[in-house]
Design a protein with these regions (language model features):
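Short amphipathic alpha-helix that is part of the acyltransferase structural core
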Residues: 1-40, 164-209, 338-347
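Flexible, substrate/cofactor-facing loop regions flanked by secondary structure
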Residues: 161-261
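Active-site proximal loops enriched in glycine and acidic residues that flank catalytic Cys/His/Asp
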Residues: 234, 246-252, 265-270, 277, ...
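Extended hydrophobic-aromatic, low-complexity segments
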Residues: 86, 203-204, 226, 230, ...
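Conserved acetyl-CoA-binding loop-helix of GNAT-fold acetyltransferases
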Residues: 92-110, 265-268, 274-291, 296, ...
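Acyl-donor-binding surface of acyltransferase catalytic domains
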Residues: 72-79, 83-178, 325-329
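Conserved donor-binding loop and adjoining core beta-sheet/short helix segment
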Residues: 22-116, 126, 242-259
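Active-site/acyl-donor-binding loops of N-acyltransferases
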Residues: 125-160, 228, 283-347
Length: 347
């Protein structure tokens, strides 16, 4: 690093500065400094920090100018997040980037060794307008792997009737069953997990994830709510069985002061495809969003989805607001033949 610069793990007293840094960096890319402050706090010092290793880089005056995180996303996959102060300038940033990315690689490999693995895939998400980060990754051995559509659908009060007006025979959508205190029953949680795991088996960049890993990761989100998880039961030879599921969360208020709903996952089992399960689940989420007085439902979809999901979303009123990109770099631990799990589509 440049002379006088230093690094350390973030502490509670850094949260406000990190929120400001993330907001400034986002504004420099898309013109909006609106961020989820609770998410920044959780990743830095809260529950989401449990599955992340991170470092802040400070200039000679002690100001945080870079925040890097390595998320142990799954066996064989390490998500890397890099937030830099746009005011750094290209010369300083070009000097810092190799050091920070080398740190991320070393941490990811250390975590992999802890899992008994011989390596991992570094995965970084880049906004389509972030040419600065794209250039840094390209110069440090990363390659563009995929493009994702970030879509949003406005919600109107009349949408509460969608599940009734668009009901599909042989498909019933319900929220996961919960006890009086709101805690969900294990059978339904396992059904949601199974539907999502099995439905994403033929999707890009989908890694095997254990049931506890799945639950912990989704519960980390500040907007997590058990009453935002749905199951679509389908009738098969006179019996009702799960055919699909949705895991959603609360979106923070937008510029108009109204919250929304975000669909983290929607999965339809391969044997249930073609029966209107996906649309039935989407109608349930839209109707629930309308009943709660919210104004939008957002989601992410693969630009090259094997199921043509983007076409379904577009036909139901979703529009693409912007795109993000996945940049990858595969790294291995030297001197070991231990396995490196692949994405299921690559197995």
């Amino acid at each position: 690093m440049p002379q006088g610069w230093s690094s350390r793990a973030p502490v509670d007293g850094d949260v406000d500065e990190l929120i400001a840094l993330v907001s400034t960096a986002k504004k420099a890319v898309d013109g909006s400094g609106s961020i989820e402050e609770e998410l920044v706090t959780s990743e830095a010092v809260g529950e989401a920090s449990w599955t992340r290793r991170q470092v802040v880089v400070m200039d000679p005056q002690g100001a945080i100018r870079v925040w890097a995180r390595v998320h142990d996303r799954a066996a064989g996959r390490s998500n890397v997040d890099l937030t830099t102060d746009p005011a750094l300038g290209a010369e300083v940033e070009d000097r810092l980037a190799p050091s920070v990315l080398a740190w991320a690689e070393s941490i990811a490999l250390r975590v992999s060794r802890g899992r008994g693995l011989g390596g991992t895939r570094l995965d970084m998400s880049v906004h389509e307008d972030d040419e600065r980060l794209r250039g840094l990754l390209r110069d440090n051995g990363f390659t563009l792997a995929r493009t994702w559509l970030q879509m949003r659908r406005p919600v109107e009060p009349g949408d509460v009737d969608l599940p009734t007006t668009h009901a599909r025979e042989g498909v019933v959508v319900r929220q996961v069953n919960r006890r009086e205190d709101g805690t969900p029953f294990a059978a339904d949680l396992q059904a949601v997990y199974r539907m999502i795991e099995e439905s994403f088996a033929d999707h890009f960049n989908s890694y095997r994830e254990s049931f506890p890993e799945f639950l912990l990761r989704l519960r980390e989100a500040p907007g997590h709510r058990w009453d935002h998880w749905w199951i679509a039961d389908i009738e098969v030879e006179g019996h009702w069985v799960p055919g699909g599921a949705v895991a959603a969360a609360v979106l923070p208020e937008d510029a108009s002061g109204v919250p929304g709903t975000y669909i983290d996952y929607i999965g339809v089992h391969r044997l249930a495809r073609g029966r209107g399960v996906a649309k039935s689940l989407l109608h349930a989420v839209i109707a629930d969003t309308a009943r709660r007085g919210r104004n939008r439902v957002a989601l992410e979809v693969d630009d090259d989805s094997p199921t043509g999901a983007d076409g379904i979303y577009a036909s139901m009123g979703w529009v693409t607001r912007y795109r993000t990109e996945s940049w990858h770099r595969d790294v291995r631990v030297e001197g070991t033949d231990d396995p490196v799990p692949l994405a299921r589509l690559d197995e």
